[in-house]
Amino acid sequence: SVFWRPEDGEQTIRIVPTADGDPFKEFHFHYNVGKNPGILCPKRNYGEECPICDFASKLWREGVEKNDDTSKREAKKLFARKRYYSPIVVRGEESKGVRVWAYGKTAYETLLSYVLDPDYGDITHPENGTDIVLTYTVPGTPGSFPKTALKPRRRPSVLCDDDVADCDELINSIPEIETLFQRHSTSDVQVLLDDYLSSDVTSEGL
């Protein structure tokens, strides 16, 4: 898979520069809609109408008006959530090419603080950028979330050494992140929502 997930413990990654100069891609997804792994929100991503947003907002308002915690909880599950994606090289696995790392707001803010820090500057620069040490902690108790700690290396380094991997091939393997997700029209999203709601009603009726 082009997507990379950190493993428990420490690993070193390098964020790779993109053609448009922005290696931190932001997308909004709806989760918990049936068995769909994540639906791109037409409204938050593209400024189009989104039936899931409309339904979740209506559900939330009803929950507030009727003081119904169940409705509010269901609405929260359906609200669009923000995820960030960056092309990376995993040190020691350069031969696997450029992969895509998905992460949340906290990791994004940490990375941004390094980018804006003049001591580091452009951490993605191919000649004098900075590797990031990522420490991933798998949760020990059910219901808790994994933790991601990020720390830049003290010294800048080159993105790629030809002794380790074919650098031209590595750069050419940078995926266009926008193309990795299926974009649904408003009517497509309505169908997905209707399917989810009808299956939900059916399961409740059993």
For the regions a protein language model found, what residue spans apply to each?
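OB-fold ssDNA-binding interfaces and closely related basic DNA-contact patches used
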Residues: 1-122, 183-191, 195
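Compact mixed alphabeta submodule
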Residues: 91-206
